[in-house]
């Protein structure tokens, strides 16, 4: 929705990853489940700045495989859980505007007083909107205030946006037509 130049230019030399802190129903239980201290919180992996040099030095792919093999029963949110479990000490939180998750619009997350301004600014001027969960902007019943923006940008990029309401009506009309016009047949034994 907005330029990512500022995000792209962020210095991440001393960290492995920069991402937005996830303030969702999962955010307090995930660190406990993943066996790291709660005070490190939890980040969303939807938008990340990755320090590839640090990941290579850590042999991160091998570390992920090893973690998954020994902790698979604790992993609920796939890659995101693994990333948090392995990088919780080597991350930096970035502004919510770089990954405004749509559940922020519907939930009432606990906002620390020091993040209130960031929250308000992100809602007024998001840079990246992340449609998490079941509400997707291409679905007829999506009530996101950013749905129209999504459709406008999709059309600008040449994507055909289906009006799901019409698709659903067509589907039911087709079924109804088949049921009503079905020829009666007689089974002969």
Regions found by a protein language model. Give the residues of each.
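Short alpha-helical segments and helix-capping/turn motifs at coil-helix boundaries
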Residues: 4, 33, 112-116
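A glycosyltransferase accessory/donor-loop signature
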Residues: 45, 50-189
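Short, flexible, glycine/charge-rich loop motifs used to bind or transfer phosphoryl groups or to couple energy/partner
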Residues: 6-9, 37-38, 82-83, 118-119
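A short secondary-structure junction signal
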Residues: 1-6, 28-32, 58-63, 141
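Extracellular/periplasmic catalytic domains that process cell-envelope and extracellular macromolecules
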Residues: 11-12, 40-42, 120-123
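Surface-exposed acidic, glycine/proline-enriched linker/cap segments
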Residues: 24-38
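A recurrent flexible, glycine/aromatic-enriched loop bordering the glycosyltransferase active site
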Residues: 36-47
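GT-A fold catalytic core of metal-dependent nucleotide-sugar glycosyltransferases
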Residues: 1-27, 49-50
């Amino acid at each position: 929705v907005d330029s990512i130049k500022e995000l792209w230019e962020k210095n991440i030399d001393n960290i492995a990853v920069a991402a937005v802190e996830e303030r969702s129903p999962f955010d307090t239980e995930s660190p406990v489940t993943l066996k790291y201290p709660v005070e490190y919180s939890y980040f969303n992996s939807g938008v990340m700045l990755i320090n590839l040099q640090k990941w290579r030095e850590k042999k991160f792919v091998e570390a992920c495989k090893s973690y998954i093999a020994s902790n698979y029963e604790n992993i609920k949110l796939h890659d995101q859980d693994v990333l948090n479990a392995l990088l919780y000490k080597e991350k930096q939180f970035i502004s919510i505007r770089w990954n405004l998750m749509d559940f922020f619009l519907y939930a009432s997350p606990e906002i620390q007083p020091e993040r209130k301004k960031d929250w308000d600014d992100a809602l007024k001027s998001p840079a990246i909107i992340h449609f998490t969960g079941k509400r997707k902007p291409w679905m007829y019943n999506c009530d996101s205030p950013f749905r129209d923006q999504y459709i406008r940008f999709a059309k600008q990029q040449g994507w055909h946006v289906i009006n799901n309401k019409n698709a659903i009506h067509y589907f039911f009309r087709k079924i109804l037509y088949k049921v009503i016009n079905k020829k009666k047949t007689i089974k002969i034994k």
